[in-house]
Structure formats: structure tokens, C-alpha cells
Amino acid sequence: MRILAVTAEMFPFVKTGGLADATSALPQALERKGADVRTLLPLYRGLTPLVRGRKPVLVANILEQPVSVYYVVSDGHKLLLLEAASLFDRDGHPYGVKGEPFADNDLRFAVLSKVAAEIALGAIDGWQPDVVHVHDWHAALTCVYLADSTPSVASVLTLHNLAFQGQYPLERAGMLGLPSHLCTVDCLEYYDDMSFLKGGLTTASAVTTVSPTYAREILTPEMGMGMHGVLARRRGDLRGIVNGVDHDVWNPATDPYILANFTAATATRRSLNKYALLQALGLAPTQGPVFGVVSRLTWQKGIDLLPHVVPLIIERKGRLIVHGEGDTALEDSLQALAKRYPELVCAHIGYDERLAHMIQAGSDFIIQPSRFEPCGLTQLYALRYGALPIVSRTGGLAETIIDANDAAIEAGVATGFQFEPANEDDLRAALERAISAYNDRELFRRLQTQAMQANFSWDKSAAQYMALFESLVGNSTRETDAVADIRTETFAKIRADRRLAGTPGSPTG
């Protein structure tokens, strides 16, 4: 099976978060199952050496932008690198610079999506995909551009985070080559603007999220981010598939970023990594627990809860290490804590892959206090490295971590600690339970071993994706008649709801 993946970021080429890890590991897992996966990725400034001296496989003018596509195999990945210098050859990260998004992000990612659609329809000689797999709002317009194609092309939209929806002025739709009949509440229109994500949700052949729990949560008004109505009508095409861990990248036995490699059988060697981590960050050595946080520093991630539990951590002779970037106010509050407790708290603003690995290998616990979490990868890495996760009971966190309550401890299945989302008191109670377990060395070693033996391989997830792709391709040449019927029914229900509500562009429609 030939699969075209479309994404704005992919490790090790460009990464701002877990999306890059997922879009890197899944294609390789699918390849191991016999698929031919090629990933369309923008040629950002730092990637230009990859195409130097190569001939493009596609040259075109897309939305009045000259573009070239190069086929490159690098780091085990089959890449289709999209060169559009005026759009992607820039300073900053993929979406903006100095915390501000680029003003033309709608055009940038519309071009990415339009090129993906052209490739899906056979624009590259000798290779045409059976399925297009697009990730998040950046690539969601691919499904919209393919909506009227003949023959139809099967497409799957994976939601890594529903909070990001690609919302732009509707009057820019013409510039993006979007036909007027799709610029309505039936598809793209969203509160008189347009939402790339909503367009993808209504036109994709199937929709996936990165955990079954999150797939259920987003059907509710509380967690659906205004899209719960659209998602409810696609319920039959919506499923959750848990992300996995890339064992080639996240493997404590071979990790080149850490001082002392180890396995579950030699987990006592983690103490060497703990000492090295504290020393590298200028923190005082301790016999107490080290708590690590590797995260975007945002309200969604619950980072605002951390300052409230620092006194408890310090009182118990612990250390807190926070690594990430995000909201300026949260960054400032964490840096203020680090300044107040210079040998006890570290706030490392930014992202460094080596430090992320060191924190997993040297921390005793990893805290993830997210208010909502589609899947989460950090807690899966923590399991692999024996850093017991302390997570909020939501989304993929609830699904992948087994709370160390009395029953789970007795059954020998506990792998971490859970608490109620956005609940400071419950987080404090979870920390108390974790510290108590840490002080019981026999119990703590047992929990570490159970955590490290948890299996979240990408091969399991890839098998579910392959089954989905095969069902879409196998039920018809490209897209099943049933999917087309569901889409028509969805549009009709949306129109009916809009008339009843009397609200143009309702987000639930």
C-alpha cells in the first residue's frame, strides 16, 4: 500500500512538540508492515542542504506560488520536501517567530495541502498514493481540496490536538483556491471565518485521534473545542489509536544522550544519571526525589499548577526541573521560582533534545498536569526510562498510566500516579503518594520495573492504522460510497441545525 503522509513537522528534521515524534515513528512502523510511505514536509531553511544538487520530481505553480518537490531518503525516512522559498525559507520555527505566528500561515499551509492533493491525484510520475494521511490543521485542507476529485481519494485526518484549528478570515478563501460551495457552514465556515480543521473534519474519509479516551472526550461540549457537533456526526468514522514510542530514539539501553545506559534489570544505574543531571543544571545533590517536567509551558498543560506544589517538593528534599517553552507569563513565573530557589529548582526555557533525554533518565518522577491531553508522549518516554509518571486523569494520560492505588500495587500492574485535572489539592495528594512510594525502596523499584516493562510500541498502533487504511481502499477503488453518503447526511444535518439555531456558522455545525 502506498501512503502519502502530510505534516508540518517531523523529527529529526523539525520539531516543536510531540507531533514531530509521532509523524516520524509511525511511517517507519508502517513500512515494517509492508507499506510504502512518503512524507510531504515543507523545506524549511535548515533543511535546504538535503536537496542541494538534486532534481525535483515536481515543479508547479500552486496558488500563484512557484513550488518544487524533491524526493529524498534521509535518516530512514522517505521524504517529499516542498520547496516554496517565499513561504518556508524563514527564520523562526515552523509557525512563527518570537512567539508571533506568521501573518500568511493560511497561505503557507494551504500551499502544503494543495500540493499534497495534487500528488494524491498523480502529479508525480511513477508514484501515486492509495491513501493520504494528514496531521492536524496544517494539513487538513488536503481533504477539502480532494473533496470534489474524480476518482475520489481516501483520506485520513489525525487530530493530535483539537485546540489548534487553523481559523482565518473567510474572505481569504478565494485566494486559497477554495471553491465557494465548500466555504459554507457545511464545510469550512466557522463563526463567519473559516477553519481549516473543520473543513478537514467534514471532508476526510475517516478521522482519528491519538487515544480512544480522547476520541470519546471530544464528542462532549466540554472537550470538543467547539467542534463536538461536527465530530458527533462523524462518530462512525472516528476512532482513537494510541501513539507509541520510537524504540530506536527512546531506548535507555542505547541512548547516546545519557551518561549511564541501563535496562529494567540494571535500573540502579539511573542514580548516575540523576547525579549528572543535577550537576549539569547547577542543582544541589539530594537523596530525595527529582521531579521532571518536559512540556510546552501553557495553560492546557497545567503548568500554572506547578508553583503551588514547589513548597511541598522542597520540604521533602526534592528537586524540580522544568524544561520547555510557551506562554511568557508562565515562563516568567517559573524563572522567578528558579531564582528564588537556585539550587533546588531549575527552569530551562527552550527545547533541547539532549536535555529532554537526560531529564527522563535522571528524574525519579515526571509530572504531567495537563487539563486535557489527546495522548501525550512524555509519559510514555517516562515509562520506558523508569521515571514514574504523575499525570492528570484525562485523555491518553488516563489510558496509558495505571494508578498506584492499593489494588493495582497488589496486582503488580501499577505504573504511575493519577490525579484529577486542574485540581491543585489532588496534585498535591498524588505527589505525597509518589514521595511515600519513593521512600519505600522495595516498592519504588517494583513500580519502576513495571513501568519499564509496559509495551507501547508503534508496531501495535501501526497495525490499527493499516487496518483502517485497508478498509478505506478495499471497500471501493478509493473511497467507499458509504463515506460519501455519510458526508452528504452530515451536511444535511448541519444545515438543519443551523436553521433551528438561527446562528450562522455555529461551531457545532
UniProtKB/Swiss-Prot annotation:
Organism: Agrobacterium fabrum (strain C58 / ATCC 33970) (Agrobacterium tumefaciens (strain C58))
Pathway annotation: Glycan biosynthesis; glycogen biosynthesis
EC code(s) of this entry: 2.4.1.21
UniProt catalytic activity: [(1->4)-alpha-D-glucosyl](n) + ADP-alpha-D-glucose = [(1->4)-alpha-D-glucosyl](n+1) + ADP + H(+)
Binding site for ADP-alpha-D-glucose: K15
GO biological process, one term: glycogen biosynthetic process
Cited InterPro entries: Glyco_trans_1, GS/SS, Starch_synth_cat_dom
Entry GO terms, CC: cytosol
Keyword Cell membrane included in the entry's annotation: no
The keyword Transferase is assigned to this record: yes
HAMAP family per the UniProt record, alphabetical: Glycogen_synth (MF_00484)
SUPFAM superfamilies for the chain: UDP-Glycosyltransferase/glycogen phosphorylase
Protein name, entry field: Glycogen synthase 2
Role noted for this protein: Synthesizes alpha-1,4-glucan chains using ADP-glucose.
Keywords: Glycogen biosynthesis, Glycosyltransferase, Plasmid, Transferase
Name of the gene encoding the protein in the UniProt record: glgA2
Stated family: Belongs to the glycosyltransferase 1 family. Bacterial/plant glycogen synthase subfamily.
GO molecular function, one term: alpha-1,4-glucan glucosyltransferase (UDP-glucose donor) activity
